[in-house]
Amino acid sequence: MTSDRSSIDERHEECEELMLKKAVWFLSLSLVLSASALRAQDQNQDSDEIKDTLARAKAKGVLTACADPYSWPYSQQNGTPPGFDIEIFQQIVKLGGMRAEVYWADTGTRGGLGRAFRNSIFAKRCDVFLGLSDNGEDDALPDKLTYTRPYLSLGYVLVVQGKAANLKTLDELKQNNIKIGVSMTTPMDDYLFTNNIPRELYLGNRRIMEGMAKGEVDASMVWATAVAVAKQEFPDAKFHMVDGYVPRPDQRFNSRFAVRKEDKSLLDFVNQSIDQLLSSGKIKQILESYGVPFYPPVS
């Protein structure tokens, strides 16, 4: 009996000792976590006080972009891959020893791009706005923003199938009297009309590609990114872009990012990074991985 009681007492002591050790361990862990949190808070407070945007981003280790969540293949919030603009931005940020974050700014809602600017980059929820086409002049942007250097150009590409599958140029299509699907009241529509090239008018690129998938036309001139979108929507379609086709310079438009005008050091960093990524061929590689042809910026 005495032996049993002694054994029970020993077990109680062991339990109490174990509970005490656990309590000490949890207390120590809490103190470490609290100290780490305080240090991180102090670091964030210190970095928040840095006025220069690029220096502040480097202090935090994060540079944030604004992008449209529903603009694939440029960018998308839910899905992989994330879009070529996102991947290009990630490469830019990597060159600066930072990581990329994205604040999603829907440009397709009421108020459009202007509202997206107000709710994002003007509100300093991000520092770089992605996915902008331009005419080369800053007056296309609000006064508070400025363009970066162009990182690529996009334009109309020639897509063929069926009886036009082996034709390579607009002249060959004209000689064979093959109608070309084109979006009405666009520069390409005007070009085909002016040069007496047979055409079939559609309401937008998506409708053109749907028409090709249905066999309504065997050739089309569409925006470069439209083919990548159509390949997802119509995976069994037989159309393809003509290899080596290069849009005329006056039918191509540069793509750029934008930053706030006061962020001069950030602008210089992004411009230098774009030059480096163009020289290395990285931007071309990213674009072509999305099924979008790469064309260098036009001057």
Name these PLM-found stretches:
Residues 17-26:
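Bacterial N-terminal signal peptides that target proteins for export
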Residues 26-34:
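Bacterial N-terminal signal peptides
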Residues 36-40:
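Sec/Tat signal peptide C-region and signal peptidase I cleavage site
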Residues 41-54, 86-95, 163-164, 171, ...:
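Extended ligand-binding regions for polar small-molecule ligands
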Residues 44-132:
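Extracytoplasmic small-molecule ligand-binding "clamshell" domains
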Residues 64, 69-72, 81-96, 157-208, ...:
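Bilobed "Venus flytrap"/periplasmic-binding protein-like clamshell domains
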Residues 68-69, 150-160, 224-225, 231-275, ...:
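Periplasmic-binding protein-like
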Residues 102, 108-127, 142-146, 171-172, ...:
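Short helices/loops that flank or line small-molecule/ion binding pockets
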